[in-house]
Structure formats: C-alpha cells, structure tokens
A protein has these predicted regions:
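Conserved nucleotidyltransferase catalytic core and NTase-mimicking acidic/glycine-rich helix/loop elements
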Residues: 130-277
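Metal-dependent nucleotidyltransferase catalytic core
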Residues: 1-8, 16-27, 35-92
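Short aromatic-enriched loop/helix-cap "lid" or pocket-rim segments at secondary-structure transitions
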Residues: 25-28, 103-105, 195
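Generic secondary-structure boundary/loop-capping signal
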Residues: 51, 107-109, 115, 199, ...
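Conserved NTP/Mg2+-binding pocket subregion across the NTase superfamily
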Residues: 55-170, 269
Length: 277
C-alpha cells in the first residue's frame, strides 16, 4: 500500500476476488487481486521496475503484452506476479472509464480512496456469483448441445482419434454437463450459494453419490475407460436434467436422449473395420 500512497497518480485501490469474499474458504494460496485507479497509464505500461517492488518474482505474465489474444490498448494494464515465497498478486492499473467496471464487481473491498469517490460502494458480497435459474430456452439448448456433442465423442472413439475425443468430451460436453450440475446445485441451495469458479465448491452441496459419479466422468486415455466415462456422463446429465425440468416445469427432450443414446451404443458395438452403420 505504501507504493500506492506515495504515487500521486494512483487515486484509488481496491481488492477483488476470493480475498474480498467472506464466504470463500481461506488458504495459503489465495491470490491478491488488486486494481488501481490512475489518471495516466504511461508509467505502468510495460514497466519492468514495477514487479520487483513487491517481491522476488518466480514467473511473471503481462496479458496486454502477449501476442495472442491481441491487446486492446484501452487504458488497462496488468501484471500477474507469482513470487518465490508462494504469494501471488494480480495487479492492474486502470483509467477511470475502465475502473468503473472493476468496482461494479460485488466482490470489492476499498483499500485506498484518496478523493472520496468510492464512498457509495456497498460492502463486499458474492451476490454477483450466485447461479441463475435457467430459462426454458437455455435448458433446452443445453440438453441439445450435450447430446449433439456426445455423438461426436462416440464417433471419435470409433475412429481412434484420442485428442479429438478428449477435447470434445472434456471441453464441449463437459461444459453442458456442468451447466446442468450448477442448475441442480442452485435448486438445492435456493440459488443463494455460489458454486465457485469452475464449480470448485460444488462438492459440499452435492449428494455424495452424485459427486462419486461425477468423478467417474474424468477418464484416462484408454478408450474403454473413455466409453465408460461417456456413459456415466449421459446418466448424470439425464438424471439431473430431469430434476431441473421437473422443478421449473420444463419438458425434458427424452426423444433426443433416446435417439443419441441408442446411436452411441450402436457405435460402441461396431467392428473397427465396419463399412456401414
């Protein structure tokens, strides 16, 4: 904080992220997400003298200085700093128009306010991170995409295309599965608890049986195990989707489920040299 207090160009500093969340579990690896409001960006743009001020750097990343994705150069610069002592600081500098978006985050704690411009910010809370109930359209789209991609996975296994299979299953199919898991979690918690980034807090509220089945969807590279994980994925998705549909009065697309499930089982039983389906 002395760095910010002694720099007249820095007008305010806030803390975001898990350290601003009273409900987040505390541990030794929590990052410090710090954002600084500045009047002039030029002193903080690609400045190699800034990171060493906070400790001995193990590895440094500057997102706005990376080739991909291309930087927008829009009045924002970030230093992601992992220190050798185990601490990490994500330090950003923002011009006023971009700092507005930073302080709109419900997880915001004021650390410094030289001009009294942040006095109306409410106490930090995780309300922005609560799951939201699905619309029927979102629900139907999720079901459709899950079963659509599941067929891709099955065809990829038959073709012996490991990298394609793992990507389709662990990125696209899992994305839809986790949407459904979060909606189910929301129902169980009345949509008043946050599932955490990537669902990291789901385990504490899911039935142990469901969590055990979810673990089984993470397979190794052996195709027999990938098949099994795909079937378990389908079982969990179907079970939770029917619960979600029942809770909100939606119609579960059973016909799509049946069509794709039967197709997947048929592919599994196809000989490797099959000339027709």
């Amino acid at each position: 904080m002395n760095y910010a207090r002694n720099d007249d160009n820095i007008r305010a500093v806030v803390l975001n992220g898990s350290r601003a969340n009273l409900n987040a579990p505390k541990d030794i690896f929590q990052d410090y997400d710090i954002a600084c409001l500045v009047n002039d960006m030029s002193p903080y743009f690609k400045n190699p003298n800034i990171p060493p001020l906070f400790g001995e750097i193990m590895i440094l990343q500057e997102p706005e200085d990376m080739q991909e994705p291309p930087a927008e150069n829009d009045g924002h610069y970030t230093y992601l700093m992992q220190f050798k002592d185990g601490n990490r600081i994500d330090l950003s500098f923002d011009l006023p128009e971009l700092f507005k978006a930073v302080i709109e985050d419900s997880l915001t704690v004021i650390l410094l306010d030289k001009d009294g411009i942040l006095k109306d910010i409410p106490p930090s809370s995780d309300k922005d991170y609560m799951p939201k109930p699905p619309t029927e359209k979102l629900f139907q789209d999720c079901c459709n995409e899950f079963w659509w991609v599941s067929a891709y996975v099955a065809k990829g296994i038959w073709r012996n295309e490991l990298t394609f299979v793992k990507h389709m299953q662990d990125v696209y199919a899992r994305e839809q599965l986790m949407k459904m898991v979060v909606w189910y979690f929301g129902i169980k918690t009345d949509f008043k608890e946050a599932p955490g980034k990537m669902g990291k807090y789901l385990k504490k509220q899911l039935d142990p049986e469901i969590w055990t089945e979810l673990e089984k969807t993470y397979s190794d590279a052996k195709f027999e195990n990938v098949w099994e994980s795909l079937f378990v994925m389908g079982d969990i998705f179907r079970r939770l989707a029917k619960d979600v549909a029942s809770n909100f009065g939606f119609q579960y697309p059973q016909q799509e489920d049946d069509n794709v499930s039967n197709f997947i089982y048929k592919i599994k039983n196809l000989p490797a040299d099959a000339k027709e389906i």
